[in-house]
A protein has these predicted regions:
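TerminUS-proximal long segments
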Residues: 168, 172-213
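Residues forming anionic-ligand binding surfaces in small-molecule and nucleic-acid pockets
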Residues: 7-15
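Aromatic/basic-lined ligand-recognition segments
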Residues: 73-79, 134-170, 183
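Core segments of cupin and vicinal oxygen chelate
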Residues: 24-70, 107-110, 114-117, 125-136, ...
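Vicinal oxygen chelate
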Residues: 15-26, 83-117, 169
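Extended hydrophobic/aromatic segments used for targeting, binding, or gating
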Residues: 61-64, 69-75, 80-88, 94, ...
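Active-site lining segments that contact anionic ligands and/or coordinate catalytic metals
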Residues: 57-59, 68-70, 95-97, 164-167, ...
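Short, small-residue-biased leader/transition segments that mark boundaries at the very start
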Residues: 1-3
Length: 213
């Protein structure tokens, strides 16, 4: 391998940074919203109230004025939960996960899986069985989604034939408590609202398996 090859290694198909998720102490969400809003002119575009099997969280999704930088802010609903666990392990507030975007999520996920990346537990079989009811008219390959546990969300194929689909999958923690999200957007600009609870419960299950609760 020549020096030039080492300087420009082959990629795995991720082309842009989609968003960063910021975990904060309970009660600090408004403070951090003011920070991003006052200094960088961010605005709120989504608010989530998520309840898992044992714990819950609030999430306030922000975007920059140009719309290209997005930062959801998360805080726990109670005194215990995955955000509290993160804050203890991270020893403070910080980035929970980094989302990177692909043009072909199936190929990219196959590649990084072969390289040893491990993923959060996938959803049950019924999730895929009912995917056409949730995301109308989608023609995503169910077998390839199930292979690694890729999630699907969005409005599907809407009036006029426009496609609004989001595909996403999450790694297990790789840098302390930090993990990665791998995402492909097909006309959908959301955060996978329909999958948010599935992700929350997957993290919850992994933490329970480690004895964190």
């Amino acid at each position: 391998m020549c020096i030039r090859d080492r300087a420009h290694p082959a990629g795995v198909g991720f082309h842009y940074l989609d968003h960063l998720t910021h975990n904060v102490f309970k009660g600090n969400m408004d403070k951090w919203f003011a920070f991003y809003s006052d200094l960088f002119n961010f605005r709120e575009i989504r608010f989530f109230d998520i309840q898992g099997k044992h714990t819950g969280l609030f999430s306030r999704a922000l975007t920059s004025a140009c719309g290209r930088i997005r930062i959801p802010i998360n805080e726990d609903r109670g005194e215990t939960g995955q955000i509290v666990n993160y804050l203890k392990k991270y020893k403070g507030e910080g980035i929970q996960h980094i989302a990177v975007g692909a043009h072909d999520i199936y190929s990219s996920v196959d590649t990084i899986s072969d390289l040893g990346v491990k993923f959060m537990p996938g959803p049950p079989e019924v999730y895929y069985t009912m995917s056409h009811d949730r995301v109308v008219g989608h023609d995503e390959p169910i077998d390839r989604m199930k292979k690694h546990g890729i999630l699907i969300d969005g409005e599907g194929v809407v009036d006029g034939g426009e496609t609004k689909i989001l595909l996403q999958i999450f790694s297990k923690t790789v840098i302390g408590p930090i993990f990665f999200e791998f995402i492909q957007r097909k006309g959908d600009d959301g955060f996978g609202e329909g999958n948010f609870k599935a992700l929350f419960e997957s993290i919850e299950a992994e933490e329970m398996s480690r004895g964190d609760y």
